[in-house]
Curated annotation (Swiss-Prot):
The keyword Ribosomal protein applies. Belongs to the universal ribosomal protein uS9 family. The gene is rpsI. GO terms for molecular function: RNA binding; structural constituent of ribosome. It comes from Borreliella burgdorferi (strain ATCC 35210 / DSM 4680 / CIP 102532 / B31) (Borrelia burgdorferi). GO terms for cellular component: cytosolic small ribosomal subunit. One of its GO terms (biological process) is translation. Transmembrane segments: none annotated. It holds the Pfam family Ribosomal_S9. It comes from the Bacteria. This is Small ribosomal subunit protein uS9. PROSITE patterns: RIBOSOMAL_S9 (PS00360).
Length: 136
């Protein structure tokens, strides 16, 4: 795992993915400011349950308020983006301090959630749903 030095400040980067969303998370020591796509975290993710889900790695490792986060996220909807942010924060925290590995791994935050939307098949209405069958 590689740490990069950015203007004499220790900076850690993690990439998170979920559904079709990709989040690049940059962490450095600071006062707890969180920016997502140059917007405030609370204004970008407005649903409370998605906010708590995205910040759960910081709460779990007792580092909420100790680091500044700059997050660049694109693709998908707000739920997939929140999951990608959580995955990216977990990876960046692991790169910053490897003692976090056991906590994050046991809660499944370092594992990529591989579930994606199943494609629609021809001859069917949706991915699994068939057209109505008429016997006569």
């Amino acid at each position: 795992m590689k740490k990069s030095n950015f203007s004499n400040v220790n900076l850690s980067m993690g990439t998170g993915r979920r559904k079709s969303s990709v989040a690049r998370v940059y962490i450095r020591e600071g006062s707890g400011n969180i920016k997502v796509n140059n917007r405030d975290f609370d204004s970008y993710i407005q649903l409370e349950n998605l906010r708590t889900m995205a910040l759960s790695p910081l709460v779990l490792t007792n580092t909420l308020g100790k680091y500044d986060l700059y997050i660049n996220v694109y693709g998908g909807g707000i739920s997939g983006q929140s999951g990608a942010i959580r995955h990216g924060i977990s990876r960046a925290l692991f790169k910053l301090d490897e003692s976090n590995k056991m906590i994050l791994r046991s809660n499944g935050f370092l594992t990529r959630d591989s579930r994606k939307v199943e494609r629609k098949k021809f001859g069917q209405k949706k991915a699994r749903k068939s057209f109505q069958f008429s016997k006569r």
